């Protein structure tokens, strides 16, 4: 699984590097952030107790763009509420708001979304569902093609959250991801 994530991030970095024009390098602060879903059983670690710290951390590190995992719609809304960020991505359960998101959150004054989409890691990637030997739940990839407003450079960002146990699901998800890229 680590190899898959390495290839995914390598592809992102190569995409950014290849989009450089006239050897003018543009830098972005990018990250991946597993928000941890909001569940009442978390008690004092519930989202209500964590959201201010999460927001502080995001703004402290001044991420330009980052992918999230396990965030419910209301958690994503809490992050973008101050107005400096926007997001793309859908809930994994219905393709709208239900279920966890693998959202891409970005500074809305720095990037334009030129194209975007979502697909599920299953035998039917356009329909919400889980595939192969996935043990838990639907898994999704959210992606977007961005344009950096300051440099004019374009790049793609793919954000994933694989099944944590199904080895065949992980392998097939990687193959599907590479096909989509």
Say what each PLM segment does:
Residues 36-40, 160-165:
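Short strand-loop junctions, especially beta-strand C-caps/beta-turns
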Residues 167-181:
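A long, amphipathic alpha-helix that forms part
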Residues 1-26:
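Bacterial Sec-dependent N-terminal signal peptides
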Residues 18-83, 93-100, 174-175:
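N-terminal, active-site-proximal structural segment of metallo-dependent hydrolase catalytic domains
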Residues 55, 145, 178-181:
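Generic structural signal for well-ordered alpha-helical scaffold segments
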Residues 42-46, 131-132, 167-171:
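Short, solvent-exposed loop/turn segments at secondary-structure boundaries
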Residues 14, 31, 158:
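Active-site-flanking beta-strand signature of metal-NTP-handling nucleotidyl enzymes
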Residues 65-158, 162:
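Structured beta-strand-rich core segments of catalytic domains in phosphoester-bond hydrolases
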């Amino acid at each position: 699984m680590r190899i898959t994530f390495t290839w995914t991030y390598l592809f992102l970095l190569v995409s950014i590097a290849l989009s450089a024009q006239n050897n003018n390098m543009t830098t972005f602060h990018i990250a991946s952030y597993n928000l941890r879903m909001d569940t009442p059983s978390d008690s004092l670690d519930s989202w209500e107790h964590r959201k201010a710290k999460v927001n502080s951390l995001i703004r402290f590190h001044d991420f330009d763009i980052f992918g999230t995992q396990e965030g419910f719609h209301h958690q994503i809304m809490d992050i973008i509420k101050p107005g400096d960020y926007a997001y793309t991505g859908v809930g994994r359960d219905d393709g709208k708001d239900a279920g966890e998101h693998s959202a891409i959150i970005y500074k809305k004054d720095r990037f334009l979304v030129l194209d975007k989409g979502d697909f599920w890691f299953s035998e039917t990637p356009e329909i919400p569902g889980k595939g192969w030997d996935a043990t838990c739940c639907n898994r999704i990839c959210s992606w977007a093609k961005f344009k950096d407003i300051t440099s004019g450079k374009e790049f793609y960002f793919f954000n994933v959250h694989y099944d944590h146990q199904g080895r065949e699901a992980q392998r097939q998800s990687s193959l599907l991801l590479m096909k989509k890229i």
